[in-house]
A protein has these predicted regions:
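Active-site loop architecture of trypsin-fold serine endopeptidases
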Residues: 1-9, 13-62, 66, 179-180
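C-terminal recognition in membrane/secretory proteostasis and scaffolding
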Residues: 14-19, 53-180
Length: 180
């Protein structure tokens, strides 16, 4: 939906009248001669699920805490990556790296060839296929679950493929550090 200047902070409704987000900003671009900014008609909103999680924390303590596992991956789990890792399909969240002092350091394995400049695709990393029994189709599913359905200090059960074998590991979710 187009958001005009001055609408930031207002609710974004769906056709049923439900609040689905809070308008946050608009995309502006130089659309007129002379470089005068104009509204491109593209708006960005904070999803209601994020607002519902953050606002009570801000009211209570003045800051929001976010969960994290301390892993690296991307939403680009390709067919080539799956084949290189002896998997039938690119389904799940591929763990490319694990932060050495992060929450998942003892439980998950990252790719073994990330330092190899000649490596075409990462190999050897775990693939997370479920968290607490919820299927994970890609890294974005994992990020959303961790951010919106967990709290720092909570244990989560991860179903992983490691070397082609399915197993379960438990990780205590950490609190994402500030990036001041």
């Amino acid at each position: 939906a187009a958001i005009n200047p001055g609408n930031s902070g207002g609710p974004l409704f769906d056709l049923s009248g439900q609040v689905i987000g809070v308008n946050a900003q608009i995309e502006t671009m130089n659309i007129q001669a002379g470089g005068v900014p104009g509204n491109s008609g593209v708006g960005f909103s904070i999803p209601a699920s994020v607002v519902n999680k953050v606002v009570p924390q801000l009211i209570a303590s003045g800051k929001a805490r976010w969960s994290y596992l301390g892993i690296q991956g991307s939403s680009d789990f390709t067919v080539e990556m799956a084949k290189a890792n002896n998997l039938a399909e690119p389904r799940g969240a591929y763990v490319a790296g694990v932060q050495p002092d992060g929450p998942a350091a003892q439980a998950l394995k990252g790719a073994s060839n990330l330092d190899d400049q000649n490596a075409e695709v990462p190999i050897g990393g775990d693939v997370i296929t479920a968290i607490d029994g919820e299927p994970i189709d890609d890294f974005d599913d994992l990020l959303s679950y961790v951010a919106l359905k967990t709290e720092p200090g909570q244990d989560v059960r991860l179903t992983v493929l490691r070397g082609g074998t399915e197993q379960e590991v438990t990780v205590t979710v950490g609190e994402r550090p500030n990036r001041d």
